[in-house]
């Protein structure tokens, strides 16, 4: 069995680790922006290179796609989405994204591209192929979102050993060396989601007692609050709205994120965006100051929203805030001073800040990978399901079978009956949530059990069994106890990716990887061509008069041909460019021979001159020495 990695697939940034060590990416950074872009030439960019070109390619630069993963286009959260790229409803109702040239991608595919990039970084570090991984998800992710994340891993060519909750992973990294039992809270405010988990840890046992959260609350919302403020202020000052200008919006978003980060350490920052737009009177510039106090007033409601899940989690455990031993902060947004203050006010103690909030989840995932593979021993992890799971019963009532905060894996059965006389089939609708009516909860999927013998209503006995595995993914079965007929399914909602779609995306990912390798070779060959042209032109300038006119002309023609070929952006021209490099290299050999001879002759002259000088110096020294001796003798 090969070594397994731990991956934190984040909304804003992602991170990969192995055996408690963070692996740097190709750019040498410890975290990778969760950004994927497609250029006009068809090149796919991931991470920092994708983020750098976002201003000029906003419609084809996809960020924060974790907020779309496992979601239907009609979900309420989609209304607040503030992104410059096209989001549309796929055939199955899922939220997908589209490039300006019409190419369609599922959020799982975009996640897979990021996972592939992290996988390659790990392989470069380890010097071997990596197949197995543990991937983290927000604790409050529902079944559809967990399944979509697992699909992303599969598309990326990874065997997903386990899907683990982010706060639980953070607790593993924090508490692995803690021997004495105590209760901790993990407050995880990331780029797109918020989770809070309460755990009891000690002697290698990590038991989650309760978890709560909001899968649509994070740093992106803080950025959007600043963006809205800047847009309003600019419109007041200049009378111009910028919402419909993608390039201006991207510049403002980047400036907002930068200002937010700066105000974690400074009391005031200046946002300066020259030439943001223009009107009949000329160019307009966005220039304004933002104080920490103003930022806090803009995002105060968002910070307050994190307190409600904290209260619910405490209520579910029956604990009070003063019974919490430690509060561990996770996620980049927990660097904000006002967030730290609010957590301190609520729990009545200074939060623990001894872990890196950007890296601790990936480290915990790597530890979990070690546990699954048997490399890390004497550690027991007991996680919970974040949401109640049940079925729709008569009158549209939601009947839970497994309550929220039940330790997983778990299995629960309950017997139901028919609602009408002589009913020969029942449809089982599976929901997840906390509302009383089924329609108000998330419909995970439905299936039918047919062939029930006709009987008065209430007589048939249909046993419905729910099974939640260690990944938090749901499996359901229904059995007619009279006939023994059984129907088993792994929940797959009306949305979600089918097996054939996943296989198609795996093939596309493999093809794209081959294309990326081809493009990499193309760039390397073009760089080689540029270098050869430069060195040859320099040599021609210095030594062109030393070769025959015919040879000089042939070399100049070969240089021009290579220059022209190098202008191509078609990766299929790589062999043609390589051929012209070989041709120029062979022709340049005569020029190289001339340079070598010239160099040898020059060295010979210097050596001869040096030898003559040495002899003369020796004679002079001898003469002087003799004179001195004579003088000494005459004394």
Curated annotation (Swiss-Prot):
Pfam families: HSP70. Residues 597-612 have a biased composition (Low complexity). Residues 533-552, 595-635 are annotated as: Disordered. Keywords: ATP-binding, Chaperone, Nucleotide-binding, Phosphoprotein, Stress response. The modification Phosphothreonine is found at residue 193. Residues 535-552, 616-635 have a biased composition (Basic and acidic residues). Gene3D superfamilies: 1.20.1270.10, 3.30.420.40, Actin, Chain A, domain 4, Substrate Binding Domain Of DNAk, Chain A, domain 1. The keyword Hydrolase does not apply. The keyword Phosphoprotein applies. GO terms for molecular function: ATP binding; ATP-dependent protein folding chaperone; unfolded protein binding. Induction: By stress conditions e.g. heat shock. InterPro entries: ATPase_NBD, Chaperone_DnaK, Heat_shock_70_CS, HSP70_C_sf, HSP70_peptide-bd_sf, Hsp_70_fam. Acts as a chaperone. PANTHER family: HEAT SHOCK PROTEIN 70KDA. NCBIfam families: PRK00290.1 (NF001413), PRK05183.1 (NF003520), prok_dnaK (TIGR02350). Belongs to the heat shock protein 70 family. This is Chaperone protein DnaK. It comes from Wolbachia sp. subsp. Brugia malayi (strain TRS).
């Amino acid at each position: 069995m090969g070594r397994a990695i731990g991956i934190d697939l984040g909304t804003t940034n992602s991170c990969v680790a192995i055996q408690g060590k963070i692996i740097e990416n190709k750019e040498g950074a410890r975290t990778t922006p969760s950004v994927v872009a497609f250029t006009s030439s068809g090149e796919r960019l991931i991470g920092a290179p994708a983020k750098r070109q976002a201003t000029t390619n906003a419609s084809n630069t996809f960020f924060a796609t974790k907020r779309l993963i496992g979601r239907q286009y009609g979900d309420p959260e989609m209304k607040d989405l503030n992104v410059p790229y096209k989001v549309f409803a796929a055939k199955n109702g899922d939220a997908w994204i589209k490039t300006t040239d019409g190419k369609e991608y599922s959020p799982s595919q975009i996640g897979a591209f990021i996972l592939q990039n992290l996988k390659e970084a790990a392989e470069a570090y380890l010097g071997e192929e990596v197949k197995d991984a543990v991937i983290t998800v927000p604790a409050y992710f529902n079944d559809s979102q967990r399944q979509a994340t697992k699909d992303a891993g599969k598309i990326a060519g990874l065997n997903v050993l386990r899907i683990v909750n982010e706060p639980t992973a953070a607790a593993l990294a924090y508490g692995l060396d803690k021997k004495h039992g105590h209760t901790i809270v993990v407050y995880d405010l990331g780029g797109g989601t918020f989770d809070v988990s309460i755990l009891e840890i000690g002697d290698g046992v990590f038991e989650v007692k309760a978890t709560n959260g909001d899968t649509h609350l994070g740093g992106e919302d803080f950025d959007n609050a600043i963006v809205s403020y800047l847009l309003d202020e600019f419109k007041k000052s200049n009378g111009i709205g910028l919402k419909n200008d993608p390039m201006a919006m991207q510049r403002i978003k980047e400036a907002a994120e930068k200002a937010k980060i700066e105000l974690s350490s400074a009391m005031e920052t200046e946002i300066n965006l020259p030439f943001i737009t223009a009107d009949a009177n000329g160019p307009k510039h966005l220039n304004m100051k933002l104080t920490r106090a103003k930022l806090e007033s803009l995002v105060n409601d968002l910070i307050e929203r994190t307190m409600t899940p904290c209260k619910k989690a405490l209520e579910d455990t029956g604990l009070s805030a003063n019974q919490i031993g430690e509060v561990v902060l996770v996620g980049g947004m927990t660097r904000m001073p006002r967030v730290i203050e609010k957590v301190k006010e609520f729990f009545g103690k200074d939060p623990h800040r001894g872990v890196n909030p950007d890296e601790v989840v990936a480290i915990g995932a790597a530890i979990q990978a070690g546990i699954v593979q048997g490399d890390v021993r004497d550690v027991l992890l007991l996680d919970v399901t974040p949401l109640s799971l049940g079925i729709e019963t008569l009158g549209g009532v939601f009947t839970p079978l497994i309550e929220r905060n039940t330790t997983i894996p778990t299995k629960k059965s309950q017997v139901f009956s028919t609602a009408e006389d002589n009913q020969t089939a029942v449809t089982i609708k599976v929901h997840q949530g906390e509302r009383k009516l089924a329609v108000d909860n998330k419909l995970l999927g439905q299936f039918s059990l047919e062939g029930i013998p006709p009987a008065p209503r209430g007589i048939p006995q249909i046993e419905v069994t729910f099974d939640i595995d260690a990944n938090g993914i749901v499996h359901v079965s229904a059995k007619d106890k009279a006939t023994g007929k059984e129907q088993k399914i792994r929940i797959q909602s009306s949305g979600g990716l089918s097996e054939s779609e996943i296989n198609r995306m795996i093939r596309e990912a493999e093809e794209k990887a081959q294309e990326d390798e081809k493009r990499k070779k193309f760039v390397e060959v073009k760089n080689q061509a540029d270098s050869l042209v430069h060195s040859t032109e320099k040599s021609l300038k210095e030594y062109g008069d030393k070769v025959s006119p015919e040879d000089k002309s042939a070399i100049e023609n070969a240089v021009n041909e290579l220059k022209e070929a190098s202008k191509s952006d078609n990766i299929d021209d790589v062999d043609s460019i390589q051929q012209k490099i070989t041709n120029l290299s062979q022709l340049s050999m005569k020029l190289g021979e001339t340079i070598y001879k010239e160099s040898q002759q020059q060295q010979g002259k210097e050596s001869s001159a040096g030898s003559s000088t040495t002899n003369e110096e020796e004679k002079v020294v001898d003469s002087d020495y003799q004179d001195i001796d004579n003088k000494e003798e005459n004394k």
